[in-house]
């Protein structure tokens, strides 16, 4: 019986690395697909004689067939693992995946709620005067008007809010602190919320946003409340506090803010992270076109 390098590798994963049956099946399918491909190119090709060009052609073949870059990357990872295993055991003389890079995944455009939808939610829809209604509206306003993260909002204490100077201090990723400005409208809303909270709830601790029992709100509490309110005005499938962060950034850029300013407000370490929002600012391009083109 001829030695089968793929079977040998799969047995290694099964009995020495204790990989799951699902992983083994995925690896097996990916590797056999590659084997079928290179043999269809040249019946004389083998695992030992495949080169970088064959690997690249295979990935292009998969992409041309409509496969997502992430799925091609998964198959490539299986192939690279096989060759690293084979090279370490002297089953092949070279690794044809060594200088090959998997296809880059296309960045998904951030989901955001339109300015008109946010205006409708905050200005037109009726909000009650109960503690929960006042709190939830203030939370949504805070997300939309400052762009802070969910973890940053749930971590806020009263001492972090300065309504006189209209700024809040947040602790972001890596415990990095930054100061974020906000407008008069949010300052009024925060003052109204704090007054309502102190009247209606017995607070346990220093948290700004609390439950009806006075405890600091958990992330899932905030997430569910935000989703429920956003669903009243938006048909987006994904509705969350992070979508409000995207909405903040998009609104800022659409209305003339620079990438660097938005980067600092969001607490991004690199402008490359913020640049993804430039793909969503079509309204700004539309306005420029309408103002500048003689036939617009």
Predicted regions and their residues:
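Conserved catalytic core of the tyrosine transesterase superfamily
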Residues: 1-296
